[in-house]
Amino acid sequence: MNYFKAAAELIKQHRPDWPLLIGPEEKLFDSLQIGGHGGVSGGANLFPKLYVKLCEAHRAGNLARAQELQKQIQRVSDSFYRIGKYSSSIIKGIKCAASCLGICDDFMAEPFHRFRAGERELVKTRLKEIEAEIAKLNF
């Protein structure tokens, strides 16, 4: 986060018209705390309201709510991005979950391959769990 903080300071001083976005959604709240404007978050393809509500809560100064939503975002990451043993697991997890939600197909270009049946079932189970948890957040 040191590099991100330095970038935030430079942008604030020299290019305040530029947005500053973070990649790892696990750091979204932290990035907002030090001057970031949002993120490029894979999980936002699955649960866009969750990510928008975190940014809105932070912007409104409701840090407790923003932290609560960040915990749920961490849960999304933990649930879908670490299935399997390859570095492609984050892409596979997002694509498979998006496919299960009817957003897109889970076909992946070579050299990658979609999850097999067992992994897909795990994604479906975790999707149901996450959807139930998000429903309790009342937004």
Language model segments and positions:
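C-terminal alpha-helical cap/extension of soluble enzyme domains
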Residues: 36, 47-139
